Regions:
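An N-terminal, well-structured beta->alpha segment
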Residues: 1-68, 72-73, 162-187, 395-399
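General beta-strand structural signal in soluble alpha/beta enzymes
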Residues: 5-6, 51, 77-82, 102-103, ...
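Buried hydrophobic positions in well-ordered alpha/beta secondary-structure cores of metabolic enzymes
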Residues: 8, 51, 88, 101, ...
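Gly/Ser/Thr-enriched, mixed-charge loops and adjacent short helices
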Residues: 13, 113-244
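N-terminal small/polar loop signature for handling phosphorylated ligands or for N-terminal nucleophile
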Residues: 40, 48-112, 204-262
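Gly/Ser/Thr-rich active-site loops/lids in small-molecule metabolic enzymes
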Residues: 124-126, 215, 267-286, 354-364, ...
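Proline/glycine-rich low-complexity loops and linkers
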Residues: 131-173, 178, 264-337, 344-345
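Phosphate-binding and adjacent anionic-ligand microenvironments
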Residues: 248, 285-461
Length: 461
């Protein structure tokens, strides 16, 4: 992680930690950098950069300032308008863009926003390029073996163009529809669009495949994104599924790069369940390449026991679908993801894609002719307590010797009956303390022991 960019982009409260000036400078640098890179390789055409945004009020402000920076540096800016993060990755990859930018703070409240950078292969941006962007934000331009006083402006006909590119978003919708292996006719599906990016995409896909679709939280007003809605507030979808007698429900977050499910009984199906269900489905069909499902350190203890019972191997990465994808690409794995619902199907996408995930869960249900509750039943989730402690200095809190002693003491007490994980958030000034054990009370007790030490040492904000 850098000074500005965390595991999922540059994120903060709009016009506090993340300002319009930041966005303009990011546009200025990227527009020049990719254009100069092309010129040095004998290509005199302008850089082409595609931009998407979610439904936050501030997303429009950041879009306009990013575009201003891009075209001032000579790049052409292609606007997908309100769309999902995975659609930006798809369009960047398939339409040969130099890079993509998504304006979103994902599951955060409306007053936050973020800038996510995506390379021309549709993958999260590499650390080297992000470091160059951060240097420019701090007034330093050292690139291509040279030092510049400032990124040069484009002039006359070298000033970039702005292109309405809603056609790119529409092609992404068509791509999702093309992945439907079965007709959804007769299946009653609930969708919670979080008043975010999925609001004008998810229903179109499910309707095209024949589902009887019931939608909630698809009326964005700029301030209601993720407000008691979507994958972080799934109780509304649970109620809808039960009251309407639906077969399944899917909840997305603000930029629709994650998905959680609700089975026909109203139970929540987490990202760990999805990894288990699809991993078993792939193994049964002989398509689980390397016989490995990629998880993160936050996946439930019970998931690994279930994989062991099924003879499925697994890998653990740091938290962040960026790290999951890097491992998958390096090792040839087909399925990986996070408990939170960021799931990557590497045959079809290079990032987590919530709508794609829901289509794949529909595929398993229809192929096996089983309800979601039965597909998920073999996975026994261990009780888990996770507490997010907002701190003044997360690195100091994490490395404090007394905190580490408290963690070691809990680890010893749990033995092989559970685990404790204490880590820094990649996107917030937060320490996450998580315990899994056979009993909820034990989990809470051990979480409290560690959190109390963090507070006693004065780290709590």
């Amino acid at each position: 992680m850098g000074k500005y960019f965390g595991t999922d982009g540059f994120r903060g409260e709009a016009n506090e930690n993340l300002t319009a000036d930041h966005a303009y400078k990011i546009g200025r640098f990227l527009g020049w950098y990719y254009g100069e890179q092309k010129r040095r390789n004998g290509d005199d055409t302008p850089a082409r950069i595609v931009i998407g945004k979610d439904t936050r009020r501030s997303s429009y402000m950041f879009e306009y300032t990013l575009v201003g920076g891009l075209v001032a540096s000579g790049a052409d800016a292609y606007l997908l308008h309100v769309t999902t993060t995975p659609s930006v990755a798809y369009v960047a990859r398939t339409d040969n863009f130099d890079c993509g930018i998504m304006i979103s703070a994902s599951h955060n409240p409306y007053y936050d926003n973020g800038i996510k950078l995506i390379n021309g292969n549709g993958e999260k941006m590499d650390e080297e390029t992000i470091a160059l962007v951060e240097d420019y934000l701090d007034g330093k331009v050292e690139v291509f073996g040279e030092t510049y006083e400032e990124v040069p402006y484009a002039h006359k006909d070298r000033i970039g163009c702005t292109v309405d590119y809603v056609a790119g978003r529409n092609r992404y919708v068509g791509y999702l529809i093309s992945l439907g292996m079965y007709s959804f006719k007769g299946v009653k599906v609930g969708l919670d669009c979080a008043n975010g990016s999925a609001w004008n995409i998810a229903k179109a896909v499910f309707d095209a495949l024949g589902a009887k679709t019931y939608v909630i939280n698809a009326e964005p007003d700029g301030t209601n994104i993720n407000n008691n809605a979507g994958s972080t507030h799934i109780e509304g979808l649970q109620k809808l599924v039960v009251e309407k007698g639906l077969d399944v429900g899917f909840a997305y977050d603000g930029d629709a790069d994650r998905c959680l499910c609700v089975d026909e009984k109203g139970n929540v199906i987490t990202g760990d369940h999805i990894l288990y269900i699809y991993g078993c489905y792939m193994k049964e069909r002989g398509k689980l390449l390397t016989n490995t499902v990629v998880t993160t350190v936050m996946s439930n203890f019970g998931l690994y026991k279930a994989f062991d019972e099924q003879g499925i191997g697994y890998a653990k990465t740091a938290v962040g679908d960026k790290y999951v994808y890097e491992y998958m690409a390096k090792n040839g794995c087909r399925i990986g993801g996070e408990q939170s619902g960021h799931i990557i199907f590497s045959k079809y996408a290079s990032t987590g894609d919530g709508i794609l995930t829901s289509l794949k869960m529909m595929e398993v249900m229809l192929a096996k002719k089983m309800p979601m509750s039965e597909l998920a039943a073999p996975l026994k989730i261990y009780p888990q307590v996770l507490e997010n402690v907002r701190v003044t200095d997360k690195k100091a809190a994490q490395s404090d010797s007394d905190v580490q002693k408290a963690v070691a003491a809990v680890t010893e007490k749990l033995g092989d009956t559970g685990r404790i994980l204490v880590r820094e958030s990649g996107t917030e000034p937060v320490i996450r303390v998580m315990v899994e054990a056979p009993d909820q009370e034990i989990c809470q007790k051990y979480v409290d022991e560690v959190v109390n030490v963090i507070c006693e040492k004065g780290y709590k904000a």
